[in-house]
Amino acid sequence: MSDIETFYDVMRRQGITRRSFMKSVRSPQHVLGLGPSFVPKIGEAMETKPRTPVVWVHGLECTCCSESFIRSAHPLAKDVVLSMISLDYDDTLMAAAGHAAEAAFEETIAKYKGNYILAVEGNPPLNEDGMFCITGGKPFVEKLRHAAEGAKAIISWGACASYGCVQAAAPNPTQATPVHKVITDKPIIKVPGCPPIAEVMTGVITYMLTFDRMPELDRQGRPAMFYSQRIHDKCYRRPHFDAGQFVEHWDDENARKGYCLYKMGCKGPTTYNACSTVPLERRRHFPIQSGHGCIGCSEDGFWDQGSFYDRLTTIKQFGIEATADQIGWTATGLVGAAVAAHAAVSVLKRAQKKNEEA
């Protein structure tokens, strides 16, 4: 891989000064939640390590992961694609098409065998020998297996590749299957979401480039740095939940006041993702901030978990102490009763305080 330029080489060729280069290093440092002491290490990695070859393939999907990725602000998607990595194949973003694109695919996986990262967006359908998704004249599942043979690691972008998403929802007529159930002999990083957060996607790539290893994963194979806490734990509407203040109808006064959306079906208490932290840092909206509850799109099988507007009744407890590894899918309890009791206690305490003050 010595013939591949480093990120710093590309920046210098574009006329970027070293001072500006070191400033650019701070964006991934913030996204990854690393302290200032890591800036030199990230800088050294980007200055000395060759850009990582990436092969990005698409199965059954809507391309929302790519749409999210190109909107990354820290770092910018253009810096990732044109400077940090060597994106040698992506049939959505590349200029080549048809036979030229497939030739580039074969050349890349042969030239960088054992050194490239395989990024998978979408999943392979297995019914009818994979004929429900054809790419390059062949079933996508064949292309996936072929590309995975020489990959050093695989990234499953989005809910489709990680868990199956809508195309795998019951009765799943195409037998759409998550990547990890088809490829079982390679390390796989799941980055679920529909779509995943842009900065989470670029953050995973930056981490792998900087430290030359996979990030720490939780028991479901997701990067713990982004998927270790529930959206509910850091939600800006959490104080309203604790105070027993809930939206009862979409057009009521409580909705206009920005109260908690739990009773409207918000899945934040059981969904592990960075939605309630990363978007706020970018000053951009996420569903809860726009007035709609979380639908749990980064959790396994969320399409088959009932209506997006049904109130949750199967979470274990409240608080920010538990992580995905500690409770995850085993969480149980009568949440409806717990919320009612919690709200009642909150109201009684406020009433008691007012009486004491009076």
Curated annotation (Swiss-Prot):
Binds 2 [4Fe-4S] clusters. Residues 1-45 form the signal peptide. Disulfide bonds: none annotated. It is found in: Cell membrane. [4Fe-4S] cluster 1 binds at residues 62, 65, 160, 194. One of its GO terms (biological process) is anaerobic respiration. One of its GO terms (molecular function) is 4 iron, 4 sulfur cluster binding. It holds the Pfam family Oxidored_q6. It catalyses: H2 + A = AH2. The keyword Transmembrane does not apply. InterPro entries: Cytochrome-c3_hydrogenase_C, NADH_UbQ_OxRdtase-like_20kDa, NiFe-Hase_small_C_sf, NiFe_Hase_small_N_sf, NiFe_hydrogenase_ssu. It is an enzyme of class 1 (oxidoreductase). This enzyme recycles the H(2) produced by nitrogenase to increase the production of ATP and to protect nitrogenase against inhibition or damage by O(2) under carbon- or phosphate-limited conditions. Heterodimer of a large and a small subunit. This is Uptake hydrogenase small subunit. The gene is hupA.
